Amino acid sequence: MKLSLMVAISKNGVIGNGPDIPWSAKGEQLLFKAITYNQWLLVGRKTFESMGALPNRKYAVVTRSSFTSDNENVLIFPSIKDALTNLKKITDHVIVSGGGEIYKSLIDQVDTLHISTIDIEPEGDVYFPEIPSNFRPVFTQDFASNINYSYQIWQKG
C-alpha cells in the first residue's frame, strides 16, 4: 500500500493553532480537495472533527476516545497500526492528512509528500515534523493569492 502525506505548513512550521488552521490562503484548499478526491484519508480524531467529512472521500480516523460516527465513509481505529493493517486489505493508497501526532508518527513511512508552504508566520501550537533527509522535491509551483503559497511534491529516495 502506498502512503502519501498532504499538509499545509506556514514558514515557521506551524500547521495548527488548537483545532484551527491559522490562515486562509485562497485556492490552497482546492489543492487539498483535488488531490484527496476519491481517496482514503488517515486522520486523527481532532483533525477529523475540525475538517468534517468532505464528500467523495473515505476516512480512517485514529482515536483513543469513545468517538463514533454514523457516516458509512468513516472507519474508526484505536491505533495507527490497526488503521494501516485494515486499510491494506481495502485500498492500495492512503493519504495521511493530519494532525500533528499522526504526521510525526508516519512521516518516515510515507513515500510522497504533498506540501503547501504558506507565506505567513502565525502563532500556533501544532508543528509539522522535520522532513526526513531522504526526501527530495520533484515538483514546485508558486501561487499568488491573498496569502502567497507554494505547492511542492517530495519523493522518498
From Swiss-Prot:
Keywords assigned by UniProt?
Antibiotic resistance, Methotrexate resistance, NADP, One-carbon metabolism, Oxidoreductase, Plasmid, Transposable element, Trimethoprim resistance
User: Which Pfam families did the record assign?
Assistant: DHFR_1
Q: Which residues form the signal peptide?
A: none
Q: Where is the DHFR domain?
A: 2-156
User: Which class of enzymes does this protein belong to?
Assistant: oxidoreductase
Q: What is its EC number?
A: 1.5.1.3
Query: Can you supply a Gene Ontology BP term from the record?
Result: one-carbon metabolic process
For this protein, the record's InterPro entries field holds: DHFR, DHFR-like_dom_sf, DHFR_CS, DHFR_dom
Catalysed reaction per UniProt? (6S)-5,6,7,8-tetrahydrofolate + NADP(+) = 7,8-dihydrofolate + NADPH + H(+)
Q: Which domain of life is it from?
A: Bacteria
| GO molecular function per UniProt | dihydrofolate reductase activity; NADP binding
Recorded hits in Gene3D superfamilies, A to Z, give: Dihydrofolate Reductase, subunit A
| Pathway the protein contributes to | Cofactor biosynthesis; tetrahydrofolate biosynthesis; 5,6,7,8-tetrahydrofolate from 7,8-dihydrofolate: step 1/1
What family does this belong to?
Answer: Belongs to the dihydrofolate reductase family.
Q: What does this protein do?
A: Key enzyme in folate metabolism. Catalyzes an essential reaction for de novo glycine and purine synthesis, and for DNA precursor synthesis.
Subunit notes for this chain?
Homodimer.
What is the protein named? Answer: Dihydrofolate reductase type 1
What organism is recorded for this protein? Escherichia coli
Which taxonomic lineage is given here?
Answer: Bacteria, Pseudomonadati, Pseudomonadota, Gammaproteobacteria, Enterobacterales
- Gene coding for it: dhfrI
